[in-house]
Structures are given as structure tokens and as C-alpha cells.
């Protein structure tokens, strides 16, 4: 954190007991300038991306901050999302791409962002960039897993209505959704196989224990 403002925001977040406390700490800093609001969002994203594993604290903090600040925060978040989806992803590690995408997904689910931000994607980049595919697959994977049924229906409709069918980005979006569905199906198949294997192992263990113990002495009384 290279400036006093960034350090102040960082300490407000890191000293919080929970995300509501964190949002209250940030509010106490009385940051009024639009550039200050943007800096808060930058620090939230940087802190989230620095974690070894994704921490939902930052998604909830982002939501609480946007709710408290209103339009200024929503506009700054939209600008930040445009940058992440436009050209900044190449300089990020895979962990940073994943964690930042989880934040964007949360913002989409809670309607702090609209799907129109996906239009900032470079045309054709999805098929040619592994990080861009990771970014979008993470966003939609999180939406499929976290959104309610009604919210999911609304989000999918909003996603496709944001694009023209003649737009190359529409084709990219279709491919991303197909990739996510395939990944979810593979995950489900793996879970089913694991459950089946566990059941077979349990039955095999029970059979071996039964053979070792032999017939119950009570059976001779029947």
C-alpha cells in the first residue's frame, strides 16, 4: 500500500471483525471524492486477490460498501469491471483472475453490475486467451452455483439480451456457457462416481467383517 489513503483503507478492512464492521470502518474515513471511492474498490480487489484461497468476506464487503455509497460506488465498480474484462487480465496470475472473477460474479448476482460490462471483452479474445476463458468460466460457474433459481433465470436472460446475435462476443458467450455446463456435468459425474465407490467400499468392508465374525449364535435359535 503505497499511499496514506491506501494504507488507511487497508487498515480499516484488516481490523474489521466482519464485513459489516469493515464497511463501517471505511465509512468512518469519510472519503468523499470519486477517486477515493475508486481507491476503496481497488484495495478491496487487491486484498481479495492476495488471499491464498478465495475469501467470501471480500465479496460481502464489496456489496456492503456499494450499498452504503450508492451510485458513486456502482459507477466506479463498473469502470473497474470494464478494465478487468477489457485488457488487464493478461498481467494477472491465475489466482488473481479467479479471485477477482468471484467478486465480479457476486456483483452480478446482487445487481451491482449489469451484464453489459461483458461487452468490453476484446472480440475473439475468449477463444484465444486461457486467462480470459478462466475469468468468464469462473464468473458463470459462480453464478450457476450461488444464484437462486429465479435470479439465475433473470441473469441468463440478461446475459444474452446484452448482446446482438450477430456480435462475435455473443458466440464467445455461448461457448463460455457451454464450457461451464460441461465442467459442471463432469463435476457431477465425478461426485456420483465417488459416492458409488464409497458405497462399494463400505459394503465390501461390512461383508468382510461379517465373514470374520461368522454366523450369529442367535441364528441357531431361530
Please place each PLM-identified region on the residue numbering:
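Long, low-complexity, highly charged intrinsically disordered regions
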Residues: 1-56, 71, 75, 193-194, ...
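Helix-loop junctions that connect tandem helical modules in alpha-solenoid scaffolds
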Residues: 45-49, 83-93, 125-130, 169
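Short sequence/structural elements of tandem HEAT/ARM alpha-solenoid repeats
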Residues: 21-26, 35-43, 56-61, 72-80, ...
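Flexible helix-coil junctions and inter-repeat linker/turn elements that act as hinges
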Residues: 32, 50-54, 66-72, 90, ...
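Short amphipathic alpha-helical patches
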Residues: 67-71, 124-131
Amino acid at each position: 500500500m503505497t499511499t496514506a489513503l491506501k494504507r488507511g483503507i487497508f487498515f480499516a478492512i484488516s481490523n474489521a471483525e466482519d464485513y459489516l464492521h469493515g464497511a463501517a470502518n471505511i465509512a468512518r474515513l469519510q472519503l468523499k471524492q470519486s477517486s477515493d471511492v475508486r481507491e476503496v474498490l481497488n484495495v478491496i480487489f487487491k486484498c481479495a486477490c492476495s488471499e491464498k484461497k478465495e475469501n467470501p468476506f471480500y465479496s460481502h464487503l464489496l456489496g456492503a460498501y456499494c450499498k452504503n455509497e450508492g451510485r458513486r460506488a456502482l459507477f466506479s465498480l463498473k469502470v473497474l469491471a470494464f478494465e478487468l474484462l477489457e485488457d488487464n487480465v493478461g498481467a494477472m496470475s491465475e489466482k488473481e483472475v479467479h479471485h477477482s472473477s468471484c467478486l465480479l460474479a457476486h456483483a452480478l448476482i446482487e445487481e451491482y453490475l449489469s451484464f453489459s460490462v461483458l461487452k468490453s471483452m476484446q472480440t475473439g479474445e475468449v477463444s484465444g486467451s486461457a486467462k480470459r476463458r478462466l475469468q468468464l468460466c469462473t464468473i458463470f460457474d459462480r453464478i450457476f452455483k450461488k444464484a437462486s433459481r429465479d435470479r439465475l433465470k433473470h441473469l441468463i436472460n440478461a446475459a444474452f439480451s446484452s448482446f446482438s446475435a450477430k456480435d462475435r462476443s455473443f458466440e464467445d458467450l455461448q461457448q463460455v456457457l457451454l464450457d461451464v455446463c460441461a465442467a459442471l456435468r463432469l463435476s457431477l459425474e465425478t461426485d456420483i462416481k465417488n459416492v458409488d465407490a464409497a458405497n462399494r467400499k463400505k459394503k465390501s468392508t461390512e461383508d468382510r467383517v461379517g465373514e470374520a465374525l461368522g454366523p450369529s449364535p442367535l441364528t441357531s435359535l431361530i
